[in-house]
């Protein structure tokens, strides 16, 4: 076991990414780039790379049930969390093609330069799962840093989906993306 590192130049603080004047020119292109990057990540051959032997698989049902059980163990009911949890349990995606999922792909785990995305950081929770999780996670309100733009605070759904579809050659399922956005 081990890891390889190299020095990269860029910004990783989410609030700065959505506000920095130095990134103003690239910001409108970031959602599309993120879609392209996610399509490449999700296309990695799990068997050829051996990732199927070292990463665990989490279905949407596994993920939601585990999270729901942890929440209930606190025994501090929160009506909105209860409602969201029940909604998620009632709308679990099924029959999915699984892929490598970063699982924390968001503004704050991306390094951005004036040229675009330089790196995807923090892979410690990667697993095999529903690839739409990554697209939904970057759209979660928490990662917008006060911006009204839904994708990481810097872009539109349409741009994220277009970037993904351009590389993956498959349509993005907005319903599954919304499922994971609600989960977040």
Label each region the model flagged.
Residues 1, 41, 86-133, 137:
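Active-site acidic catalytic loop and adjacent metal/ATP-binding pocket
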Residues 1-97:
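ATP-binding pocket architecture of kinase catalytic cores
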Residues 12, 51, 110, 128-130, ...:
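Conserved protein kinase catalytic core
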Residues 30-34, 80, 104, 109, ...:
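An acidic site on a long C-lobe helix of protein kinase domains
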Residues 54-55, 171-183:
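All-alpha amphipathic helical-bundle segments outside canonical DNA-binding/catalytic cores
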Residues 58-59, 108, 155, 180-184:
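Aromatic- and histidine-enriched alpha-helix N-cap/loop-to-helix transition segments
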Residues 92-95, 170-174:
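Contiguous beta-strand/loop segments that form the cofactor/metal-binding neighborhood of enzyme cores
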Residues 133-169, 183-184:
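Active-site activation/catalytic loop segments of kinase-like enzymes and analogous catalytic loops
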